[in-house]
């Protein structure tokens, strides 16, 4: 089974964070969301993935050239201007079924478990849900037949339209997600996810007295590469100081991000 990563959205509700980059390239504790997604697919054993790009496609390709070192064979297609339904259908190419991940989701649920559940049910779709109202998350397996049974012109969004309709008609099953999940569609959601990573996912850079002499640095914090923190600076817990940033004797309040 191939994977499809939907990473062409601009992230309008994330503005101004997405003024100069697509939402998939926002950095959580020094790593782009897209790289977290590919890492998740790699752990699940996926060997091929199609990246459906749009806004900022050149930036996505540059990131992959410079930073991606995983073993998944990647194919890039441009689905700019298409709905999520159209993007998934296009990215499926000749595949009969695929696992799709909308690249604004950070999730710790094992993907191989989703595949096992899907294979045990004779349905067109299996989707994760973390919602008490059973709203689908942005991770799902779909068969080609799903689009043949529903009107793609009437339904344009996978999680808002297609999957709920398929659940009602008995053509899809929902799987209760385990672990952490966050759909990053607002600055508040972004900060919540970053906070979770710092405190629960061992993303914090642990510091010793000799790292930045004369600076008061709380924990946990993330400090990237080639960062200068001058004597007298104060960095409170939960902060992210990304690559190449310089802090000169100032105070960085908790949960503030500086840098790339």
Residue ranges with predicted function:
Residues 14, 60-64, 193:
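Hydrophobic packing residues within well-ordered alpha-helices of enzyme cores
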Residues 99, 106, 112-119, 130-204:
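Catalytic-core segments of class I nucleotidyltransferases/pyrophosphorylases
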Residues 209-260:
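Structural signal for interior beta-strand "rungs" in well-ordered beta-sheet cores
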Residues 1, 126-128:
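Short glycine/serine/threonine-enriched helix-capping/active-site loop
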Residues 2-5, 27, 31-113:
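Conserved N-terminal catalytic core of the sugar/cofactor nucleotidyltransferase
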Residues 10, 21, 56, 180:
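A generic "binding-loop/recognition-motif" signal
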Residues 1-19, 171:
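N-terminal nucleotide-binding beta1-loop-alpha1 segment
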Residues 54, 77-79, 128-130, 175-177:
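Conserved beta-strand termini and adjacent loop/short-helix elements that scaffold enzyme active sites
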């Amino acid at each position: 089974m191939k994977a499809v990563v939907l990473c062409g959205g601009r992230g309008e509700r994330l503005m101004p964070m997405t003024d100069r980059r697509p939402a998939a390239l926002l950095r959580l504790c020094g790593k782009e969301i897209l790289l977290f997604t590919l890492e998740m697919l790699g752990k699940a054993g996926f060997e091929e993935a199609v990246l459906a790009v749009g806004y900022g496609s050149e930036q996505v390709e540059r990131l992959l050239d410079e930073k991606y070192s995983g073993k998944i064979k990647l194919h890039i297609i441009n689905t700019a201007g298409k709905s999520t339904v159209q993007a998934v259908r296009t990215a499926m190419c000749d595949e009969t079924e695929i696992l799709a991940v909308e690249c604004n989701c950070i999730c710790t649920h094992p993907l191989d478990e989703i595949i096992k559940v899907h294979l045990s049910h004779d349905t067109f779709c299996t989707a994760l849900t973390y919602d008490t109202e059973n709203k689908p998350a942005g991770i799902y397996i779909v068969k080609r037949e799903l689009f043949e049974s529903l009107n793609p012109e009437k339904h344009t969004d996978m999680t808002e339209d297609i999957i709920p309709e398929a659940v009602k008609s008995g053509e899809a099953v929902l799987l209760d997600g385990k672990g952490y999940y966050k759909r990053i569609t607002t600055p508040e959601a972004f900060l919540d996810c970053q906070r979770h990573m710092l405190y629960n996912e061992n993303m914090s850079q642990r510091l010793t007295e000799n790292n930045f002499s004369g600076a008061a640095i709380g924990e946990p914090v993330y400090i990237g590469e080639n960062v200068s923190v001058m004597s007298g600076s104060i960095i409170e817990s939960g902060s992210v100081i990304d690559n190449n940033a310089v802090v000169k004797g100032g105070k960085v309040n908790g949960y503030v991000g500086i840098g790339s």
